[in-house]
Amino acid sequence: MSLLLLGWLPTGMTHQDPPSWGKPRSHRTLRCYSAEELSHGQAPPHLLTRSARWEQALPVALVASLEATGHRRQHEGPLAGTQCPVLRPEEVLEADTHERSISPWRYRIDTDENRYPQKLAVAECLCRGCINAKTGRETAALNSVQLLQSLLVLRRQPCSRDGTADPTPGSFAFHTEFIRVPVGCTCVLPRSTQ
């Protein structure tokens, strides 16, 4: 799967050293872009134009609709006091999957200015257990867990244009990274009976 993804990325985005298998790794220096080369600290257009087809990934595709409906919780941890809802079939027949699930979840927008795409929709499970389909109430007989999707992102980091250890103000280097993004929740058997 990784090979297929990397096949259509620009050469500058696919920098990977060959596996070392006991040999020392040679680390190539990433290009350091000056403030003049970047528009307001954004990634260079040539890295974004042939991007990793981000708009097709669920965490990216959901952002616009979440922003339109006002679901804006940025870079925070799980909600304090989140309660597992009571499932009432008559109330959720027309609802979205995440609201009808016996392991319901909500989405929030995570924003990271040093990541491209900067905004991602991430799922948060609403229950520790799962909802019993007969009673509509949470049961601890099952556990809600996040479903994770791997997503290739572009990271920016401060860099030095003059070769010193101190970063040059407004200058950045960019590298790719796979992250795991929660896209939903599902029910599983508990790992133990404790």
Curated annotation (Swiss-Prot):
List all disulphide bridges recorded for this chain. C125-C185, C130-C187
User: Where in or outside the cell?
Assistant: Secreted
- Name the keywords, alphabetized: Cytokine, Disulfide bond, Inflammatory response, Secreted, Signal
Tell me the null mutant phenotype. Answer: Mutant animals develop normally and do not exhibit any pronounced immunological deficiency.
Q: Supply the Pfam families for this chain.
A: IL17 (PF06083)
Q: Which residues form the signal peptide?
A: 1-16
Q: Is Oxidoreductase among this UniProt entry's keywords?
A: no
Any GO BP: positive regulation of cytokine production involved in inflammatory response
Q: What tissues harbor this protein?
A: Expressed by epithelial cells after bacterial challenge. Low expression, if any, in lymphocytes.
What superkingdom heads the lineage? Answer: Eukaryota
Which GO MF terms are attached to this record? cytokine activity
UniProt entry tagged with the keyword Signal: yes
Q: Which GO terms describe its cellular component?
A: extracellular space
Regulation: induction: Up-regulated in the colon, but not in spleen or liver, during infection with Citrobacter rodentium. Up-regulated by various inflammatory cytokines, including TNF, IL1B, IL17A and IL17F in colon epithelial cells.
Protein family (similarity comment): Belongs to the IL-17 family.
Complexes and interactors: Binds to a heterodimer formed by IL17RA and IL17RE.
Record function comment: Cytokine that plays a crucial role in innate immunity of the epithelium, including to intestinal bacterial pathogens, in an autocrine manner. Stimulates the production of antibacterial peptides and pro-inflammatory molecules for host defense by signaling through the NFKB and MAPK pathways. Acts synergically with IL22, TNF and IL1B in inducing antibacterial peptides. May have protective function by maintaining epithelial homeostasis after an inflammatory challenge, such as that caused in the intestine by dextran sulfate sodium in a colitis model.
* Identification of the protein by name: Interleukin-17C
Give the source species: Mus musculus (Mouse)
